[in-house]
Amino acid sequence: MEAHLANETKHALWHNDHTKGLLHVVIPNAGLIAAGIDPALLILKKPGQRFKVEVQTRYHATGQCEPWCQVFAAYIPDNALTNLLIPKTEPFVSHVFSATHNSGGLILSLPVYLSPGLFFDAFNVVAIRINTGNRKHRDICIMYAELIPNGTRYFADGQRVLLLCKQLIAYIRCTPRLASSIKIYAEHMVAAMGESHTSNGDNIGPVSSIIDLDRQLTSGGIDDSPAETRIQENNRDVLELIKRAVNIVNSRHPVRPSSSRVASGLLQSAKGHGAQTSNTDPINNGSFDGVLEPPGQGRFTGKKNNSSASIPPLQDVLLFTPASTEPQSLMEWFDICYAQLVSGDTPADFWKRRPLSIVPRHYAESPSPLIVVSYNGSSAWGGRITGSPILYHSAQAIIDAACINARVDNPQSLHVTARQELVARLPFLANVLNNQTPLPAFKPGAEMFLNQVFKQACVTSLTQGLITELQTNPTLQQLMEYDIADSSQTVIDEIVARTPDLIQTIVSVLTEMSMDAFYNSSLMYAVLAYLSSVYTRPQGGGYIPYLHASFPCWLGNRSIYLFDYYNSGGEILKLSKVPVPVALEKVGIGNSTQLRGKFIRSADIVDIGICSKYLPGQCYAYICLGFNQQLQSILVLPGGFAACFCITDTLQAALPASLIGPILDRFCFSIPNPHK
């Protein structure tokens, strides 16, 4: 919960308007695993070890997106919901509260971009990137429609708060060596609950009901749903607490009868002045500046001569009494009892002792739902700091109504007048309703479409470049500098005989490359290094590749290549988990020129496995494919036999120009224009 508090504090300091909201979420371990993220990498085992979580909002259909921004995040390996819903008591006391076991998860907060009226575009996407330092890349992408619930579930949390009180009372009654004041506070809690407990705690014993956190997620519905407005049997004790709280408030300041009349509103004022005359003591006229009406001449008073009593001095009309400092309600006694037991209190623990809302939300990329959390004192989505929950509204209902009235299936098919009316009400639709959007509009798979187009353009340019080179120069030369021993001649002869099949298989493997394989391939890293070096942002400035593995290629000259390693025997599979940087230097051998390889080592690059022990072509077990910043490519077979080709022209032909900006905005950091 501390991560949620930190993000909310940061949000309150940076944003004082209503154009950017905040959503507190928990991504369980199952959701992290589904995204290809190993939760073990988030466990900080060494001093200085850390992970970084960044988020980005990607706008509907336009390809535009916000810059990546870092958010506070915390990973709880086990019992993440317990961390959010159960107040901490360690290290002072232990085993006070008990709850069922639950999964670990990542706790973070996500920004939500809104238009006036707290409306959001349901097709906006928030991307979550978790950087663990192992260089593997994968974003978690969730649409606003999947992320933002329709309402809160505070009503379903009432039983948890009641059980916390019962568990605290049970612990205090069963623990003899506690301060007498704590035991007195516990008995006040019992009295406030209105239950008749015996002195030895027959009804509240050491084995009280355990809080079922799984039931918290599944029982009950949205607070405002008609089904939940009916009072159910298991919630009657909560309602009874509310009634008793009202009685306590009334007992604190009871209505006292008085012989003098006290005005309480215009109607009561009229009744009070009905039997009075205007023959009164002098009254300070300054007291009437503002909204008060002259005595005896109000809109609801009688005539001046219809009564004989005098009007009491104006200063006696309002009566102020000092507020009682002694706790009265169950929650107040709960607070003071808890703080005394654990020797203090924190904002996080205070929020845990008040009703919470936890709403599971399913999204396409994971079979396990994430959890949206709202706090009673929060200003983020669902928070009740202003009294009622702060809710954001989807604009899709307004758009659907316009389409139904116009009898069209696609909002982009609306008449110009209807589109202008929508834009006037929802300004963020100005670019979306344009038929020339680079990404599909009103389609949930727009982000996947962009990634698929990017991957397909890269793979197509690579395979076409390789095939063209082999058709032009079918004989492979030994371009890498290696001395082949006589004992290895048999292996070389076998490789030569298998070369056509190997190349055909490599082309098939590249063509059928999955998105996960593409995300961690030297092909994508090199293409991003090339695009970020030659393209600038429309508003000025440039790009830096996000992934550190691209830096040797992006910063280096044409001699720095990023290589992927494939096995040369049996079924050809990609072996290297991350690209291997190698510097290729030209050397003269007699009348010919060959390439000499050297590994590029970096302190921030983790061990890249056995592939880093052999340079391209040095081991008969590997086929290597590499690219430099200018997309000059080289396919190296065992023994150093290689084919060189360039894919720059084919990439520019295969990748639509309108998608280059959106691709770089997603996979690179933006550099602002230094002249602005």
Swiss-Prot record:
Residues 275-287 have a biased composition (Polar residues). Signal peptide: none annotated. Residues 253-308 are annotated as: Disordered. GO terms for biological process: chromosome organization. Residues 253-264 have a biased composition (Low complexity). The keyword Kinase does not apply. Pfam families: Herpes_UL17. GO terms for cellular component: host cell nucleus; viral capsid. It is found in: Virion; Host nucleus. Keywords: Capsid protein, Host nucleus, Late protein, Viral genome packaging, Viral release from host cell, Virion. Belongs to the herpesviridae CVC1 protein family. Interacts (via C-terminus) with capsid vertex component 2/CVC2. Capsid vertex-specific component that plays a role during viral DNA encapsidation, assuring correct genome cleavage and presumably stabilizing capsids that contain full-length viral genomes. This is Capsid vertex component 1. It comes from Varicella-zoster virus (strain Dumas). The gene is CVC1.
